[in-house]
């Protein structure tokens, strides 16, 4: 409709990677497409699209400031709000041959230990995906025919699942940890036996209270997000919460590590930093306030909309 009547159409992605089946219609001259992750912007720019732009996300600081926090209900040492990303990878691997299983296991191991870099899209090649499809086909004519993109996503979500489960399990044995998410499987409940499962929270009213009342807010970034600052990280700091996030290049670019937020580069690093900052209340509060000040200075919706309208 916008293309037909030459009406400007603006879109701003808040997910990375963007859930796009194809780039069809993206090059319409009416479109102005903004990506919050620089890596995604560069991907589509390199495809020849000239109507794509880079624009980090933002926070409604004024709204968050006016929310009354129930510290008694939401207060805790460490909290995590988010999905655990149960992946299809184990099911997909159950029908692979031994070489394919070993190849995937190696990728998972390397990506688990790699922070600030993403190898999955490079090593899950079309050739490898085709070999998996042939393997499935040899077992059944009705077998699923997984695409390279689907297989890469399965690996990325599995690595994210392993990281989040490991982080929560270890921290839960050392500190008070609250998990706000949807359902847990029976296996997950056993692994996270020392973690308090609190169910989901409302984004607008409850989640900000969790961030403000928690001493430490975890933000293990989805592995497939190659560079962007996730909205969750900005939400945490916009509430005056203390952010402990996995290393993300754009977070390190826009925020000063250990002054406005804290970034970790391994599970061991995350555990050590959680221990340290729980034992140092004043330093933790200083970092939280500095993070909030940075949000108020450069991550307001008013500023982002002005940039968007300039285009």
Predicted regions and their residues:
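A short, gly/pro- and small-residue-rich
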Residues: 2-14, 49, 93-107, 166, ...
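A polyampholytic, Gly/Pro-enriched intrinsically disordered region
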Residues: 30-40, 73-81
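Active-site proximal beta-strand in glycosyltransferases
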Residues: 2-16, 32-35, 57, 79
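N-terminal pre-catalytic "stem/leader" segment of glycosyltransferase-like enzymes
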Residues: 1-5, 149-153, 177, 301, ...
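Nucleotide-sugar donor-binding catalytic core of glycosyltransferases
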Residues: 47-51, 56-225, 248-249
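Glycine-rich, charge-decorated loop segments at or immediately adjacent to ligand/cofactor-binding or catalytic sites
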Residues: 17-29
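Catalytic binding pocket for nucleotide-activated donors in carbohydrate/polymer assembly enzymes
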Residues: 26-30, 38, 42-50, 55, ...
